[in-house]
């Protein structure tokens, strides 16, 4: 992800139409909207903040300044794990030695940065010029055991000299050994934090431009795309599906309607070449789908799978509903190039003597010849009903080729939900699921806590459930080896009816 950090910043500023702000200007523009990006974990594609772990920690820590952001960048390194919860929850922390706390004031009394460790070593009598080499040798495990023992003894002597007791030394020495393996220097943490803040500023103040850029850059990353799309409602941005005559290869924005049109190249098995070809065809006028289909077959590189995918995703919705159009394609493929139709195949092809008399110029004992293909196709398609895919089929189709769905149906009552993700762990009767409300499109991640509930009413991915409400319980987190309740709640599925 980090390799694209500058590319994101550069492309968003270009789309906005202004040069990249210098750091002073950026920090002056950091208002509450910027810090809310972190507090609400709206950080997909933002430097250092993109992972699920990063998001969880930011929701707890809620940084509000460059200094705090820099400290967070350093604190989430593995070597700081033993003190991370204390840091994230902003609990008061002390080394237990006032003089050492004063030295570590800039890092909130923690030994977060390499410079923090260097200050600690100097305080205990090590010459400053040798401190960095010590950190490197610890990190790379270059110390022989006798050398490490000698260093520890020297530091213990310095501790006793300053503190007048050995108490507390072992804890700080362990922190040093842990942190040395992974800690950042302060300048590196600061630069990473600044890169992150650029992203948060652009996302909070220019969300339409930001999401247009990153959705295009990550078009092939379905997991990240899904996470980006889940953030759009916060900014009241609507993601419009791919549409003939509107969509090109990349995502594009419409500032008047505050919406983003999906790019064709972001769809599974599709590419920029067919996007360009279809956009060129859209400049023509087509009275019906059959005429367009003929041009697609003759003048583009679309293969049958790509055509099926785009049709199922309602790309050609101006010409009818998707199941109807898929049926039209089936009719077209069967009869567009038919020169001769055997009479013994008529029933399996859904043809009658009436149709063949009307659309074949010649008849033999066993065949119909010189077929008016276009006339036959149009009459057969005229008998098709303008159907859409059913709910389950459409959601399955979306998840297969988009890896997300935007399907809603306002004719369905608001207590119907469809399962779009289903994961089991050790106990197959305690699944974790993502549910999508068919009426509103709201998505909720929930789980079944009691196996008996699931055994009595089993379901799977793409099942439709009637749910009249959820039970909310406090989440738990590990603290000092024990699970304790937090003030954050999560929905638990206790009662439901399997509708389909």
Region locations from a protein language model:
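Noncatalytic, beta-rich nucleic-acid-contacting surfaces in large DNA/RNA-processing enzymes
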Residues: 1-500
């Amino acid at each position: 992800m980090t390799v694209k950090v500058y590319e994101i910043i550069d492309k968003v500023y270009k789309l906005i139409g202004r040069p990249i702000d210098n750091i002073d200007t950026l920090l002056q523009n950091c208002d509450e909207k910027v810090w809310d990006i972190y507090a609400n974990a709206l950080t997909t594609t933002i430097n250092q903040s993109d992972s699920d772990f990063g998001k969880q920690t930011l929701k707890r820590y809620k940084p509000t300044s460059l200094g705090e952001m820099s400290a967070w960048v350093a604190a989430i390194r593995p070597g700081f794990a033993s003190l991370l919860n204390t840091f994230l929850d902003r609990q008061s922390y002390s080394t237990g030695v006032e003089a050492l706390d004063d030295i570590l004031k800039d890092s909130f009394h923690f030994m977060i940065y390499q410079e923090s460790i260097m200050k600690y070593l100097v305080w205990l009598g090590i010459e400053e010029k040798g401190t960095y080499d010590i950190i490197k040798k610890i990190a790379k495990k270059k110390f022989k055991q006798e050398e490490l023992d000698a260093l520890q003894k020297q530091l213990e002597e310095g501790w006793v000299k300053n503190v007048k007791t050995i108490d507390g030394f072992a804890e700080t020495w362990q922190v040093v050994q842990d942190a040395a393996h992974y800690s950042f220097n302060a300048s590196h943490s600061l630069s990473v934090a600044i890169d992150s803040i650029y992203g948060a500023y652009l996302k909070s103040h220019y969300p339409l431009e930001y999401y247009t850029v990153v959705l295009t850059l990550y078009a092939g990353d379905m997991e990240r795309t899904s996470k980006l799309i889940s953030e759009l409602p916060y900014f009241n941005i609507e993601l419009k599906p791919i549409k003939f005559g509107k969509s090109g290869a990349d995502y594009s924005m419409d500032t008047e309607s505050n919406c983003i049109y999906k790019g064709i190249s972001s769809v599974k098995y599709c590419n920029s070449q067919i996007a360009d070809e279809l956009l060129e065809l859209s400049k023509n006028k087509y009275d019906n789908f059959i005429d367009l289909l003929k041009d697609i077959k003759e003048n583009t590189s679309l293969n049958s799978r790509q055509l099926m995918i785009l049709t199922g995703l309602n790309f050609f919705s101006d010409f009818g509903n998707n199941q109807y159009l898929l049926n039209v394609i089936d009719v077209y493929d069967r009869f567009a190039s038919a020169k001769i139709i055997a009479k013994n195949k008529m029933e399996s092809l859904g043809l009658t003597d009436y149709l063949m008399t009307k659309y074949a110029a010649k008849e033999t004992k066993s065949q119909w010849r010189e077929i008016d293909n276009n006339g036959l196709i149009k009459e057969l398609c005229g008998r098709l009903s303008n159907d859409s895919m059913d709910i389950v089929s459409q959601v399955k189709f979306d998840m297969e080729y988009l890896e997300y769905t935007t399907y809603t149906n306002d004719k369905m009552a608001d207590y119907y939900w469809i399962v779009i993700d289903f994961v089991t762990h050790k106990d197959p009767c305690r699944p974790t699921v993502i549910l999508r409300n068919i009426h509103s499109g709201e998505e909720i991640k929930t789980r079944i806590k009691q196996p008996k509930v699931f055994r009595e009413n089993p379901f799977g991915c793409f099942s439709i459930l009637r749910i009249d409400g959820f039970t909310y319980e406090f989440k738990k987190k590990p603290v000092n080896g024990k699970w304790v309740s937090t003030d954050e709640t999560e929905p638990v599925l206790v009662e439901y009816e399997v509708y389909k």
